[in-house]
Amino acid sequence: GAERHAQAEAIAASLQDAGYVRIGIDHYARRDDPLAIAARSGTLHRNFQGYTTDACDTLIGFGASSIGRLPMGYVQNAVRIDAYRDAVDRAGTAIARSCRFSEQDRLRGEIIERLMCDYSVDLPEICARHDADPTALIASASGLGALEEDGLITVRDGVIAVAPGA
């Protein structure tokens, strides 16, 4: 709780004093690092491995139990090394399971990515890119009232922004 938060803030202060800038929620980089530049310019991305400057929507997993991301969803290779080897020898691939993205998954994924990378998200803008009606999402943002009352976020005209230091 509070002790862990205080530790994180002490570490952040030390890193910032040493010339690092905060990237997203849990990374730091030197001001001239490509991640820091991407964060400042609004082109930072995040995948399940962390923050990145790479906008590619494909991430290929190699080896037993690896997870990959393709435009249509996630795939995971066989977990056990013997099953992985047998599958590769037999079929050339060891994909053991997959999860296909729905349009809603893609929409929610971009919303989460923007919040994690930019600390703000423009719901109407993202909905327009996904040919989705923003009305329900904007209405659901009213459920964030407690966070807004606590000064952690602001919600204005469909834009949700995390307050600095929240």
Walk through the language-model features, giving the residues of each:
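C-terminal scaffold of the Radical SAM
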Residues: 1-132
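Intrinsically disordered, low-complexity regions
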Residues: 43, 144-146, 159
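Residue-level detector of family-conserved "landmark" positions at structurally sensitive sites
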Residues: 23-25, 137, 157-158
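A short, conserved structural fragment
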Residues: 148-158
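Short amphipathic alpha-helical interaction segments
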Residues: 133-149
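Accessory beta->alpha helical hairpin/"wing" motif in late/C-terminal subdomains of nucleic-acid enzymes
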Residues: 156-166
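Short secondary-structure capping/turn micro-motifs that flank functional sites
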Residues: 29-32, 143, 164
